[in-house]
UniProtKB/Swiss-Prot annotation:
Domain EngA-type G: 3-166, 200-373
NCBIfam families: GTPase_EngA, small_GTP
Thylakoid is among the record's keywords: no
Protein name (Swiss-Prot/TrEMBL): GTPase Der
Superkingdom as given in the UniProt entry: Bacteria
Keyword Nucleotide-binding found: yes
Ligand binding (GTP 2): 206-213, 253-257, 318-321
One GO term (biological process): ribosome biogenesis
Length: 488
């Protein structure tokens, strides 16, 4: 599982500052795909070995009319669906009526909540934070998000209860060990075999009303009962086991919860958090796009999260039937222009309602999964690395050329290639993209992003005092005695 952390508080207390600090470590991945913008409200964070979804719920006024009347519906949903709430306050401004109103709402939700007094830099923090105990939510944690003070400690403390469920390992000091796998040939084969034997987890995602539920019903070959909001309805996606052409799947239905707007109309209740959690839990993502509306900003936001998560990807442009040919040509041109950065993903033009093209989706889904989990040897990865280096030499750094030594598998789904060498931390992004594309072409990878990690080659003798071996000492003694005899 991957926990969800919601940032809650009135306007201008530093929620966006903390959000940017937590999520910026993932920006480099999105930056590898020009034309893709990162969502400013939902992000994937990685800190001290913990991976989590962070949500900026936006400012809450909390006026006397009642907290719920002034809180946006999406902010309420984020609090409901979060595993941890960081309730942010302004230590400089002190306790306000809005803070008290927000605290009252949070107490009624019975959520794991941490009160954060932000902007403690340059003031007497202990004195300033004392009044926030009145919120009745327990200990007050001091932070200066702009400078990064207190951020790591709070995240580690808040997410510690989830470490075991996240599969994290602790060392003897209780610290979380960051898992960057260094597979041996045997371990890589065992991991690949495990992935090959388990069902393919397929998440069908997309913005509201693009036809996800229709596509789900078409794939399953049956009309599923529409689930309406009722007290106690699960917030999680529905997991549906299925078999197709002798292969097992688990279909993750993110469109399982609906709300009825009018008596005869059903409108999907869209939950970004539920969708993001489904992406994290999947092997392959099927992103559904409405052909009538083209590429929307919400599509790009979901696409960015899929790429950051490293999941295999297939695109389905739905409602294709009935469009005039000139409209189809215009849609294809827009797709080429706006989605050129994911040229590795297959695009299908379908009609979920009539079943046109739906059967071919699974050919691409299997192809993408097989690419994401294909076994590749260290010798092959090193050979491809050497070919890329021969075709285009790495740049010079301080008069010395960056030297790539060897490469090996670092993980699957997504495929991770770990490259070792000298001064690799100074490689420009352009050369890293060149290497990534070279590996993609050489391995004929389709439907999945490839991640490259670069590790500096450690000098095993660095920091050691020179110490001669026994044979070297004997040789040195013979040489010294020979020199002395010649002088005599």
């Amino acid at each position: 599982m991957i926990p969800v952390v919601a940032l809650v508080g009135r306007p201008n207390v530093g929620k966006s500052t903390l959000f940017n600090r937590l999520t910026r470590t993932r920006d480099a991945l999105v930056a590898d795909y020009p034309g893709l913008t990162r969502d400013r409200k939902y992000g994937r964070a990685h800190l001290s070995g913990y991976e989590f979804i962070v949500v900026d719920t936006g400012g809450i006024d909390g006026t006397e009319e009642g907290i719920e009347t002034k809180m946006a519906e999406q902010s309420l949903a984020a609090i409901e669906e979060a595993d941890v709430v960081l309730f942010m306050t302004d230590a400089r401004a002190g306790l306000t009526a809005a803070d008290l109103a927000i605290a009252q709402h949070l107490r009624s939700r019975d959520k794991i909540t941490f009160v954060v007094a932000n902007k403690v830099d340059g003031i007497d923090a202990d004195s300033a934070c004392g009044e926030f105990w009145q919120l009745g939510l327990g200990e007050v944690y001091q932070m200066a998000a702009a400078q990064g003070r207190g951020v790591t400690g709070l995240v580690e403390y808040a997410l510690a209860p989830f470490a075991e469920a996240m599969g994290l390992v602790r060392d003897d000091d209780g610290e979380v060990v960051t898992d960057e796998r260094n597979y041996t040939e045997e371990e890589a084969e065992a991991e690949q075999q495990r992935l090959a034997e388990q069902p393919i987890k397929l998440a069908i995602i997309g913005k509201p009303n693009v036809g996800k539920s229709t596509l789900t019903n078409r794939i399953l070959g049956e009309e599923r009962v529409v689930v309406y909001d009722q007290p106690g309805t699960t917030r999680d996606s529905v997991y549906i086991p299925m078999e197709r052409d002798g292969r097992n799947y688990v279909l993750i239905d993110t469109a399982g919860v609906r709300r009825r707007a009018r008596v005869h109309e059903v409108i999907e209740k869209f939950s970004v958090i539920k969708t993001l959690k489904a992406v994290e839990d999947s092997n392959v993502v099927l992103l559904v796009i409405d052909a009538h509306e083209g590429i929307a900003e919400q599509d790009l936001g979901l696409l960015g999260f899929v790429l950051n998560s490293g999941r295999a990807l297939v695109l389905a442009v739905n409602k294709w039937d009935g469009l005039d040919q000139d409209v189809k040509d215009r849609v294809k041109t827009e797709l080429d222009r706006r989605l050129g950065f994911i040229d590795f993903a297959r695009i299908h033009f379908i009609s979920a309602l009539h079943g046109t093209g739906v059967g071919h989706l699974f050919e691409s889904i299997e192809e993408a999964y097989d690419s994401a989990t294909r076994r590749v040897s260290t010798s092959m990865l090193t050979r491809i690395m050497q070919m890329a280096q021969d075709d285009h030499q790495p740049p010079m750094v301080n008069g010395r050329r960056v030297k790539l030594k060897y490469a090996h598998v670092g993980g699957y789904n997504p495929p991770i290639v770990v490259v070792h060498g000298n001064q690799v931390s100074r490689l420009p992004d352009s050369y890293k993209r060149y290497m990534m594309n070279y590996y993609r072409r050489a391995l004929k990878v389709v439907g999945t992003p490839i991640q490259l990690r670069f590790h500096e080659g450690d000098n095993p003798f660095e920091g050691r005092k020179e110490k001669l071996t026994l044979s070297q000492e004997r040789r040195r003694k013979r040489m010294m005695s020979h020199i002395k005899s010649k002088k005599a």
